[in-house]
Design a protein with these regions (language model features):
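Nucleotide/phosphate-binding catalytic cleft detector across ATP-hydrolyzing
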Residues: 1-29, 33-151, 164-277, 284-311, ...
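C-terminal, charged low-complexity interaction regions
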Residues: 155-156
Length: 333
């Protein structure tokens, strides 16, 4: 039975690292900054360190080695993760057992990519556990009972919908929709409605500041914009103006949930109707989201606390129960 000393969640937008006995030690963007003019050493910085690179040029480009939960560039993923691991004190020649927290619907080939990447990082033992299974440990739901539970993880790059029964993923899907799509829609909205161009990063700030879909919410924010002559001014954006963008996105999430429910046997659907749907991920903290999804699907919906770290905190609890963790890994392999 492997005793894991580290867990990694390689997300589309953020990478998180958990160390046993310590907790979450890293939460940084899943990004590398490349110098396109350099062939030998194109990687200039990774994660948060990219912000420290000033005077960026057109020959520099940010890339992510992950798309929809899948590793699309193993070499860049290895470079980025080695730098992250060194940052948290994981020396190359003293790496023990690694646990990947992954999306639900990975193919066998995708799983092998994660395992092989783990070995290439120098770990002696590498295993995989669906993030949803770890997440339910944080929610302190008794997974030994025979009832099915649903977890919806709305992340930055994808949305993971999972049905878990007695610690095993029974049904699920990973859809390529996430917070980045909302950011792009905000950029388009400001361009169309106000003839104002903003960056995706600025759109993300707006989304995080005005995170409500309640119809009468007075929440809003001011956006500093610069015109073509370099003059700055403030533009006020209200929740009402953003609401259609948000509802369009969350309706797609509802469609994902419905499609997974439709794939389940009647007795599983009956369970979910009783146990409800749990929301986690970065976009789960939108005010009114639980009520919106319930109104569309007709099933109780629960927003969890600290939704961005649900699977990480659940995994931390499992690190303290190695036999249970080993059982869950085997059950979902």
């Amino acid at each position: 039975m492997a005793k894991y000393n580290i867990a990694i969640s390689l997300g589309c937008t953020n990478t998180r690292i958990l160390k046993t006995g310590v907790g979450v030690v890293l939460n940084e963007p899943t990004l590398l900054l490349l110098d396109l003019n350099s062939k030998k050493n194109p990687v200039l910085a990774v994660g948060d360190d990219i912000k420290n690179i000033h005077n960026k040029t057109t020959s520099m480009q940010c890339v992510s080695p992950v798309k929809n939960g899948n590793i699309v560039n193993k070499e860049y993923a290895k470079i980025m993760l080695n730098k992250f691991l060194e940052k948290v004190g994981e020396k190359k020649f003293f790496r023990g057992s690694l646990l990947w927290l992954t999306p639900t619907s990975l193919s066998e080939n995708d799983k092998n990519e994660y395992v092989n990447l783990g070995y290439s990082l120098g770990y002696k033992n590498v295993s995989i556990l669906p993030s949803a299974v770890a997440g339910f440990q944080e929610l302190e739901i008794d997974m030994d009972n025979r009832h099915a539970h649903m977890l919806v993880d709305i992340g930055g790059g994808c949305t993971d919908v999972s049905v878990v029964v007695r610690g095993k993923v029974l049904q699920g899907c990973t859809a390529g929709i996430g917070g980045r799509d909302v950011d792009s829609s905000i950029v388009n909205l400001l361009n169309d409605a106000f003839e104002t161009k903003i960056s995706l990063e600025k759109a993300k700030e707006i989304k995080e500041s005005v995170n409500t879909i309640l119809p009468n919410d007075q929440l809003g924010c001011n956006v500093m914009i610069v015109d073509e002559f370099g003059a700055g001014s403030e533009l006020a954006i209200s929740a009402r103006e953003l609401r259609d963008v948000y509802l369009t996105f969350f309706m797609k999430v509802c469609n994902c949930i419905t499609s997974v429910i439709n794939m389940c046997p009647n007795e599983i659907v009956a369970d979910i109707n009783k146990t409800g749907i749990y929301l986690c991920g970065g976009l789960a903290n939108f005010t009114g989201l639980d009520k919106f999804i319930r109104s569309k699907i007709g099933i109780p919906v629960y927003a969890v606390e600290r939704p961005e770290f649900t699977s990480m905190f659940g995994c931390e609890k499992l690190f303290n129960e190695p036999e249970k963790l080993s059982h869950l890994v085997t059950l979902n392999s």
